[in-house]
Amino acid sequence: MKIPSFIRGNLLLKMTSLNAVVVSIRLLISAVVQRLLYDYVGAVGLYKIGQLRSLSQLLMSISSLGSFSGIVKYVAEYKTDKEQLQKLFSTTFVFTVVGVLASGILLFFFSGQLSQYLFATENFSYLIKLTAVVIPFIAIQRIFNGVIHGLSDYKKFAKIDLVSYLLSVTLTLILLFQYNLDGVLIAIALTPIIQVLILLYFFFKTLREYIIFKDLKFKSPMAKGLLAFTAMSFVTSILLPLVEIDIRSMLEEKMSGKDAGVWTNITFISKNYMVFSGSLFTLYVLPKFAGIYSAHNFKKEVLTIYKTILPLFATGMLLVYFFRHLIIELLYPGLTEMAPLFKWQLIGDFIRLASLVLLNQFLAKKLVRSFIFSELFSLVLFYVLAQILVVPYGVEGVVIAHLIRYIFYFFIVAFLVFRYFKKKED
């Protein structure tokens, strides 16, 4: 099939088009899997699955000490400088050893307490110990993905992402039919192993060009540069999952496990279509912003990104809204209380998308204080509003808090980004 010329000449459109195909396939498969999960484990089971996924998200950052965005930035900048790359990966090696040992020991020896915190029972302590054993694979997958994104190798990333997803879904379904909820949780814990194996199969030859494994040293010459990204990652990749875990626990305590499952379901739908933007940011936006130094060029690039992806997202979100009852019936039959949540979640996610485009400037230019301030403000506002609004509005109050959070967030991020350029020009 011939690619239209207007797409061929625009890298962002090419990435968007390929990404759309991969995400569409994932969404279709995910819909089937989600329905099966709902039928087998119910809303309460989905709440527990959400808790483990949040823990996995948290470990992706802790295990590599939050160096992912730093790897993307520095690989994009130094892809032709072997000496700098070796310094980068030696530092990353040190960070990973520290992160893996610290998080692995914590999970293994406090598995009972963590199981109680996440699932309100110590029955899943075996699962926490299994996750502790898998942590090295979580770290390796995160680092190698950073290299792919830094090289903007979007075709290879799409292939790796899709094959990994298909295999992890297959494992999930096999274990679901064999062991029900426990099987699904074990499959989620084991997924990083599959991801690393697929990544090495498709990408090892390229990795060897940029990482000379035998020359890696237990030294950290770029620690100062990467620690800035560690600080930024701490807020988004560690505090965010903790907030999500706490809100689910709060919903279960104040309302019911089913209500916690309802919120988990709406956020699951949201995360599935927001996956579309995540890879675009790290494959295109972050490397692009890293090479832009003037306000004029930045505004021009932001407008190009907005004109390319916002109309696509708006169309997709409108379709999700208008077909929300069908989506609920297909994925979560009988869970009609989800319907009022869609409008708040979708509008909030659209504003979030526009904000995240601008936020990548903080990562590209290592604007640590601006990044941490905006993220902390966003998380604290969301957490406080969720606690307040859940009393009069129930689960809907949490999703309303999500929308209010991102309205404030957009204006704060926009103000800080353009203040940066104004100071630079002065």
Feature names for model-found ranges:
Residues 49, 53-63, 236, 240, ...:
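Transmembrane helix-bundle signature of multi-pass secondary active exporters and lipid flippases
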Residues 111-131, 258, 322-350, 396:
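Interfacial segments at transmembrane-helix termini and the short loops linking adjacent helices
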Residues 136-160, 347-374:
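Membrane-interface junctions at transmembrane-helix termini in multi-pass inner-membrane proteins
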Residues 34-35, 64-80, 150, 266, ...:
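Helix-loop junctions and terminal segments of transmembrane helices
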Residues 14-26, 52, 57, 61-112, ...:
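Membrane-water interface segments that mark the loop-to-transmembrane alpha-helix transition
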Residues 10-69, 104, 108, 169, ...:
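Signature of the first transmembrane helix
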